[in-house]
Amino acid sequence: MRRHVFLVGLLIGGSAVASAQRPAPQHVDVPTIAPRPEDVATIDGILRAFYDVISGPAGQPRQWSRDRTLYIPDVHFVSLSTDSTGRVRADVVTHQMFVDRSNPSLVRRGFFETEIHRTTARFGNVVHVFSTYEMRERAGGPVFGRGINSIELFWDGTRWWIAAAQWDDERPDNPIPTEYLP
């Protein structure tokens, strides 16, 4: 038992050291701009922009200022994954944290996320969307992954806002159900 506790202590300590040695993401400046009316006037418009702003070829800067206009100021994103033991991990980040962490790889490698199916539930001014996506490194290139974005939106009387977004990628143990496929 004591050996087990010691090994766990080493693993935890080692993880802390590894984390401390990992460089912090470089801050990406995201100037504030006005939203494009066509991006926020309809559910279709805001979801089209949701995918458009993050997609682009290698070397092309992403449209982070435009992206920020889609969300409430304190939006949080939740990325779900499963570790090697099968335990679910939820990584909760702000918009700025998401931009800082994802920008280098998106710009270096290229990334295209495309909606392939949508299920929408609406009550009054509240909407929930399950948006199934495919991911590619090049426009029209091979699909390297799929998943579902779960997006909460609301209408404030003048425009649509995304209040929260969470997603999970398809895996062998987590196939996309047929009702969320085209």
Q: What is each stretch, according to the model?
A:
Residues 1-2:
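N-terminal secretory signal peptides that target proteins for export/translocation
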Residues 5-15:
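Bacterial N-terminal signal peptides
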Residues 21-26, 146-175:
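Short beta-strand edge/turn micro-motifs at domain boundaries
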Residues 21-69, 180-182:
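Short, low-complexity N-terminal intrinsically disordered segments enriched in polar/charged residues
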Residues 49-57, 70-78, 101-105:
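Structured segments of extracytoplasmic/periplasmic soluble domains
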Residues 50, 67, 75, 129, ...:
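Hydrophobic pocket/interface hotspot
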Residues 59-60, 64, 68-87:
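Early exported N-terminus immediately downstream of N-terminal targeting peptides
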Residues 76-77, 81-84, 88-142:
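Surface-exposed, charged secondary-structure patches
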